[in-house]
């Protein structure tokens, strides 16, 4: 399978841009920086990452696996943000 159909630009990242990369890079560079949700909730990137991992583990325990489709009945909440990262981190969509 040919994967280099378009020539890479010099500015291109040398790795795939994945949603989990947004969280993992912030965790690596500023683990104690806070994520603030509407002045109601505050989590450091470290704490938030742990929450995301717990949600991913809970979904896996419920039988969700790589490639499964997950519906999220929420929006604009701290729970939605956790699901936004947890679902693709475990390979589901």
Regions found by a protein language model. Give the residues of each.
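Anion (oxyanion) recognition and catalysis
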Residues: 88
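Flexible, non-catalytic linker and terminal segments flanking ANL/adenylate-forming cores
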Residues: 1-17
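A short N-terminal helical cap/helix-turn-helix that marks the beginning
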Residues: 14-35, 50
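Generic secondary-structure boundary/loop-capping signal
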Residues: 2-3, 19, 32, 78
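Short, flexible segments with low predicted structural confidence
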Residues: 6-7, 19-24, 41, 59-60
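Structured binding elements
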Residues: 91
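Conserved AMP-binding/adenylate-forming core of the ANL superfamily
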Residues: 33-85
